[in-house]
């Protein structure tokens, strides 16, 4: 309860979104942010080993205690469907929960897509605000029985935070982000159409935490790519 907890669930994009959110919070709030996820656990700039996307309940609580003692005010974490189904995050009062997408995966554990989606939807009974990718129709499944206030992001008319004038390039994406009458431009050095969704979710989380749209876009534009996620490798002698 003494930490601002941000949880991100979905089949793909969790690692990228959590890393981008950590960067934006550090740049805009000057906060010390803990990170829990697939690639690494991190307290500020200190890297800790990781065994699974979301630790077991006892280990998770110990890690959160360690982050609090180290001066963290915010924690952004990947929340896997296994963790939700096995109640590893029960009792954690998430300030914000976010949904990236839902595609076929982990059916050895969940057996059906319905059970898989229902497991991920549990996050939105544990958070105050839900930031959801409205470009994936499964966002409606996430909101069934939800206890949170939803904030939809995407490229369609249903999105409260919407990407317009999207430009896709080999080494970046650029877009105008509109929220009602407000608009801001962002250029992010991670290529791929999915980067649009990841960027919007990051900005939606920032907005849910009270960070201004322009400030969030400016901070996001300074983010580097995520290790092992669509890293651009220059080839000498070729454009």
Stretches found by the model and what they are:
Residues 1-134, 138-149, 179-182, 206-209, ...:
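Phosphate-binding loop of NTP-binding sites
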Residues 110-117, 144, 148-239:
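Adenine nucleotide phosphate-binding catalytic loops in nucleotide-utilizing enzymes
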């Amino acid at each position: 309860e003494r930490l601002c907890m941000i949880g991100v669930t979905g089949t793909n994009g969790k690692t990228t979104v959590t890393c981008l959110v950590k960067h934006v919070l550090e740049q805009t709030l000057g906060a010390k942010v803990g990170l829990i996820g697939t690639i690494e656990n991190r307290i500020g700039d200190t890297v800790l080993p990781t065994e699974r996307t979301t630790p077991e309940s006892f280990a998770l609580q110990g890690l959160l205690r360690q982050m609090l003692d180290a001066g963290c005010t915010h924690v952004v974490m990947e929340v896997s469907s296994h963790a939700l189904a096995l109640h590893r995050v029960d009792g954690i009062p998430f300030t914000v929960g976010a949904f990236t997408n839902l595609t076929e995966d982990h059916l050895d554990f969940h057996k059906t897509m319905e059970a898989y989606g229902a497991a991920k939807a549990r996050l939105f009974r544990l958070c105050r605000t839900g930031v959801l990718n409205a470009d994936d129709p499964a966002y409606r499944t996430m909101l069934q029985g939800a206890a949170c206030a939803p904030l939809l992001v995407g490229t369609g008319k249903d999105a409260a935070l919407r990407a317009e004038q999207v430009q896709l390039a080999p080494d970046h994406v650029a877009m105008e982000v509109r929220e009602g009458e407000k608009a801001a431009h962002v250029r992010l050095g991670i290529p791929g159409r999915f980067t649009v969704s990841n960027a919007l979710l990051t900005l939606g989380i920032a907005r849910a935490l009270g960070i201004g749209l322009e400030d969030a876009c400016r901070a996001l534009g300074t983010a580097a790519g995520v290790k092992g996620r669509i890293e651009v490798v220059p080839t000498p002698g070729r454009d």
